[in-house]
Amino acid sequence: MRRPRGEPGPRAPRPTEGATCAGPGESWSPSPNSMLRVLLSAQTSPARLSGLLLIPPVQPCCLGPSKWGDRPVGGGPSAGPVQGLQRLLEQAKSPGELLRWLGQNPSKVRAHHYSVALRRLGQLLGSRPRPPPVEQVTLQDLSQLIIRNCPSFDIHTIHVCLHLAVLLGFPSDGPLVCALEQERRLRLPPKPPPPLQPLLRGGQGLEAALSCPRFLRYPRQHLISSLAEARPEELTPHVMVLLAQHLARHRLREPQLLEAIAHFLVVQETQLSSKVVQKLVLPFGRLNYLPLEQQFMPCLERILAREAGVAPLATVNILMSLCQLRCLPFRALHFVFSPGFINYISGTPHALIVRRYLSLLDTAVELELPGYRGPRLPRRQQVPIFPQPLITDRARCKYSHKDIVAEGLRQLLGEEKYRQDLTVPPGYCTDFLLCASSSGAVLPVRTQDPFLPYPPRSCPQGQAASSATTRDPAQRVVLVLRERWHFCRDGRVLLGSRALRERHLGLMGYQLLPLPFEELESQRGLPQLKSYLRQKLQALGLRWGPEGG
């Protein structure tokens, strides 16, 4: 391809500078209000200038082989002229020359050549000491040329041309920018239509809200209003199970919703299986809420009597929820502790989890039901209840205060005078355990048996702890971390599993020292935390030597 006569030879392009010009149909002049003055004023600030005209590099696959003869993979014989045209555009000395190169070689023009031409136009208009004159017809022809060919541009070229056209001062409502913007929108992937949100009322609205993956998007007031608007036939077991799971999952202790679930369970008693009932009673135990519905417990006792032998795991799950509420029916306990039931569940896939739940029920009978005279879980069938920290604590360990409390106890007492994450019989995991003498002196744990003897079955309730303390004068102090997720949301009520553990540890003779999360969060740094722990321990009458503090 030959260069037009009268044009200077090749030379390196000047440093990239911005410029502005008017769009088609307007007279161009470097007025003070034009983009040209902004770009020229940026000459003293290379960072600003480079930022104004910074565009993504042209893809190498569009350029063809270089002048050194490198041939791109799959490049055809036209790769050389394409690259040559790009060099000519980059070295053009006037807007008219840019237009001639693009207009005289239509077979060699590729989409990226138009972005190269716009970039070179900006360099020419921003050149010093005086930019070359620009004819209005030249800008119009260049705009029309880009508008006519922009349907063949790829999305990268459209973005670059649109970016440069705006920087060069083409009006945003002019034909060039509008055409490029229209092509850009056409290249965008189709946007999925917004989900239809019909006005759902009553049970349908409640089910739609509870079926949404992001449960917390719907506040309690929305659930309460949807429940109030629902007709009785719209409240199906599926909807009520979704509501129960929602409350349990998000620790929402909402009395109005819980009472609605209890009323539904009583009304639909004959239509519900134990597998559905276990899901409906789950939030009551987890949220430590005993409903006001008078027929709630009699209804559950009748369901357990009817369905106990049909679904063993569901039966035990229902009893676990009632255990957290301290409402264990004796008749159901007789059934689950019977040899036939124990032998039956031993051969099922969920035998281990059922034995763990039965072990917890046996502990509850031992500590909380002195009047029970029925069968019990044999010793050989008992397993540790919670041999390790609960799943929620392990999942939120990085938000827990356990590590900093452990460091505070280590510096305050010494490593030998406390135990962390120790599991005590019959299988409760403690946060921190201390041993103290009858006078209150903190003793090294290794010199004492950290476990209190599990009360024998013959001991009535109320005598287990006293008999343990008379045989062993040393007292065991359990520091209980009460983290934010141990409570119901927006309340001060412990979750059922936490309340059950603390209740049983207290009945076994352990002295509990709660450490609420509000008090732990208010401590700023380890020195304040040590002072806080010192006050807590001294309030119990504990003392320790200076070597530990």
Swiss-Prot record:
Post-translational modification here is noted as:
Autophosphorylated on serine/threonine residues. Activated by dephosphorylation.
Q: What class of enzyme is it?
A: transferase
Catalytic activity reported: L-seryl-[Fas-activated protein] + ATP = O-phospho-L-seryl-[Fas-activated protein] + ADP + H(+); L-threonyl-[Fas-activated protein] + ATP = O-phospho-L-threonyl-[Fas-activated protein] + ADP + H(+); L-seryl-[protein] + ATP = O-phospho-L-seryl-[protein] + ADP + H(+); L-threonyl-[protein] + ATP = O-phospho-L-threonyl-[protein] + ADP + H(+)
**The keyword RNA-binding is assigned to this record:** yes
Q: Which superkingdom heads the taxonomic lineage of this protein's source?
A: Eukaryota
Q: What is the effect of changing residue 35 to G?
A: Abolishes isoform 4 expression
One cellular component GO annotation, for this chain's record? Answer: mitochondrial matrix
Instruction: Quote the annotated effect of residue 424 to L.
Output: In a lung adenocarcinoma sample; somatic mutation
**Is the keyword Acetylation assigned to this protein?**
no
The RAP domain extends over 477-535
Q: Which residues cross the membrane?
A: none
Q: Which InterPro entries match?
A: FAST_2, FAST_kinase, FAST_Leu-rich, RAP
Q: What are this entry's molecular-function GO terms?
A: ATP binding; Fas-activated serine/threonine kinase activity; protein serine kinase activity; protein serine/threonine kinase activity; RNA binding
* Annotated GO biological process: apoptotic signaling pathway; mitochondrial RNA processing; protein phosphorylation; regulation of mitochondrial mRNA stability; regulation of RNA splicing
Protein function: Phosphorylates the splicing regulator TIA1, thereby promoting the inclusion of FAS exon 6, which leads to an mRNA encoding a pro-apoptotic form of the receptor.
Q: What is known of its domains?
A: The RAP domain is essential for RNA-binding.
Protein's name according to its UniProt entry: Fas-activated serine/threonine kinase
Source organism per entry reads Homo sapiens
